[in-house]
């Protein structure tokens, strides 16, 4: 499984959590290979700023073309872009096997005939250099700024309990 991460460090943490679940289910994972050849590719998209949307769409199109050419078997898209524009993406890029919203890894695993490994919940396969890793302490936003799409994409602000963080 190749997991491609677009956008912010929160997406990277989501991808690392997904990688751990795939590995616990017996899959070999590669992160950000950017080479469209393999069995399964999952693209974790960004839909916040215009340049990130374009990069996400271009990446999806590149891998959709690779799927058409037979260089990969299954293509899945998740993350902010597919959360916000799922219907439009489904219509425009039918090569994608399925679009999932913002980090809906449980349904992705289920659709692949696998389950969530409870002992791995909250643990992840770190992809950053050994001297640091990102810590995702919250998700969403409670503000409704006219220029910002984060509340629309990620929902209301939710903090992780401090017991999980410490």
Feature roles, as predicted:
Residues 1-166:
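Proteins enriched for Cys/Gly/acidic motifs involved in redox and nucleic-acid/cofactor modification
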């Amino acid at each position: 499984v190749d997991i491609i991460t677009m956008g912010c460090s929160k997406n990277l943490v989501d991808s690392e959590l997904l990688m751990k679940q795939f590995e616990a289910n017996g899959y070999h994972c590669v992160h950000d290979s950017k080479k469209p050849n393999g069995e399964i590719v999952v693209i974790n998209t960004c839909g916040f700023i215009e340049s990130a949307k374009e990069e996400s769409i271009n990446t999806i199109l590149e891998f959709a073309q690779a799927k058409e050419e037979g260089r990969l078997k299954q293509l899945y898209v998740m993350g902010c872009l597919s959360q916000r524009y799922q219907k439009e993406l489904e219509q425009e890029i039918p090569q994608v096997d399925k679009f999932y919203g913002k980090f809906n890894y449980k349904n992705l695993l289920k659709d692949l005939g696998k389950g969530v490994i409870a002992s791995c919940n909250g643990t992840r396969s770190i992809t950053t250099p050994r001297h640091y890793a990102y810590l995702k302490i919250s998700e969403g936003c409670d503000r409704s700024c006219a220029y910002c799409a984060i509340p629309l994409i990620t929902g209301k602000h939710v903090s992780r309990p401090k017991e999980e963080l410490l």
